[in-house]
Amino acid sequence: YEKKKNIEKSDEYYIKANTQIKNVLRYQPLSNQKLINNIKKNFSKENLLDYVEHNDENLIFIVGMPRSGTTLVESIVASANNIISGGELRSIYELFKSRYDEDDSDSKDSKDPGSIYLNRINFIRQDHKYFIDKLPGNFHNIGFIKKIFPKSKIIYLKRDPWDNAISLFKQFYVANIPYSASFFNIGVMYANHEEIMRFWKNEMKFDFLTIEYEKLVQNTV
C-alpha cells in the first residue's frame, strides 16, 4: 500500500502489525533506564574501574540509534583504503555486560577485556590498518570503549527524533529491537539515548564526532 501511495491504508497495517508484536514481546520501557543508571554509577569520575588500556588508534566505532544513518556512514568510511568493517559486532556489548551486569556472577573477572576484543576481531581485520565496529547500540558503551581503547575514534549519528521513530516503526525487527513496535517505547529509548550521550560528553568529557543525518544526506557533493 505504501508503494501505491495509499498512506492511510499502509499506516493502518503498520499499526496492526506492530500492535501484535508489542503484545507478544511485552517490552518494558523502563528497563533501559535501569541500565543507564547502572552505567552512570560505574562510570562516574570517582568509580572508573582499573582496566588495561590499549593504544590502538585505528579502531573506529560507529554508534547511534538504529535507523539513524550508521550504515550509510559505515559504507562511506569503509570505502577508503586500508579499512575494513566488521559490521554489527556484539563483542563490546558482551564484554561490557559480563562486567557491569549486577546479576552476572562472573562480573569484573578480567582486567584486560581489550585483549579479548582484539583477539576476536583479528580474523576479520587481518592486515588492514583501520577497523570499523558498527553496532548502533554501543552508544551505551562509549565509556567502556574509551576506558580500554582511549585513542579509538567514535562517530555518533544523530537523526531527527520523529524521522528516526517512523523509520524504526516501519521495520520488522521483532526481538532484536523490541521497543520499535511502539512510538511510546521508541520515544522513551530516544530520550534515554540522549541522556547517556549528554553524560559521555558533558560529565565524562569524552571526545567523539557527531554527524547529523539530515546534513549528511543533503551533502551529495
Which residues make up each language-model segment?
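PAPS-dependent sulfotransferase catalytic domain
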Residues: I83-G86, R90-D103, R125-V221
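Alpha-helical solenoid repeat scaffolds of the TPR/TPR-like class and their adjacent stem/linker regions
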Residues: Y1-R125
